[in-house]
Amino acid sequence: WPATSKQLQSSSSEKLSYNDAIAAANRTVSEDTSNTDVRSECRSIIKTHGKKTTKAVMMIHGVSACPQQFADLGDTFFNAGYNVYIPRVPSHGLADNKRHGEITIPAMAQFMNSSTSIISGLGDETGVVGLSGGANMATWITQYNSQTISRALLLSPFYQPSASETPSWKVPLLQNLYGRNILPDSFTGSNLSYRALGKYIIIANNYKSDLKAPGLKYVGVVTSENDTAIDKNLAVNIPKQMAAASGAKFQYYSIPASFGIGHDIVALNQDEVKKHADKLYPFYLDMYEGKDVKLEAN
């Protein structure tokens, strides 16, 4: 099978005016609201100051999650003056959460492009924050929409599973047999769809060969020492190479094991994240803005 996919080799996003961007965002929210399959807490979120702001940010949730994952961190950015857009990834946040395995490559491409069009009109400087599979999408968006995205914060980026989760020889099977819907769907112990995971791996295989994102000024990466789900070498090296190829500043931080935080380092429904949110959330904002910061020791 070819590793590339035509829909993932270019972007169809467009620059929108503030009014057009707001109209498109509101349409997305109302479509989620009228879709009875979408859980009420999982609808797309738009938070604006009633006008185009100096800075705007888009936040993309992880595999099998939904916008609720970023709702609270979104408030931190909003209170710092940002317009914030947190779109729901297709097939996610549904009453039957296993249906996230129904996601398709064309739907993912369309989502990334339309979401980027919306954020383009919300601020003078626009960027993206992503968690896990959302950070994978953010990496693609940054390369193919570089005239829009100037900064990215990639949290626990999922480009490939860790060897303990999926031995490396199994990754092509995950990508080709599940990612291309040849095998019926199956689920991990934490109810992640193999078909969905395979498609995120396909996205990563469609990054630009040189990873260059012209217009990118800054990339920050945060992982947790306790995260056993992702390939951490790729989680750091792909963004680092993208920053180097683009002449952008790069910063990386690993949350110490003492914090007790695993793969999801954002959502407040994770007890340890909630416990440390007063340290973590301002830290994520500073990391996004490229400040030289460290997390206060636990």
Predicted ranges, named:
Residues 243-266:
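Catalytic histidine neighborhood in serine/cysteine hydrolases
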Residues 129-138:
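Gly/Ala-rich beta-loop-alpha elbow adjacent to hydrolase catalytic centers
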Residues 215, 221-227:
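Short beta-strand/loop motif that positions the catalytic acidic residue
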Residues 37-92:
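Short, surface-exposed "cap/lid" segments of acyl-processing enzymes
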Residues 262-298:
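Catalytic active-site module of serine/aspartate enzymes centered on a nucleophile-bearing elbow/loop
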Residues 6, 149-198:
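Hydrolase active-site cap/lid region
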Residues 94-122:
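Catalytic nucleophile-loop/oxyanion-hole region of alpha/beta-hydrolase
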Residues 73, 217, 231-243:
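Short alpha-helix in the alpha/beta-hydrolase fold that links the catalytic acid
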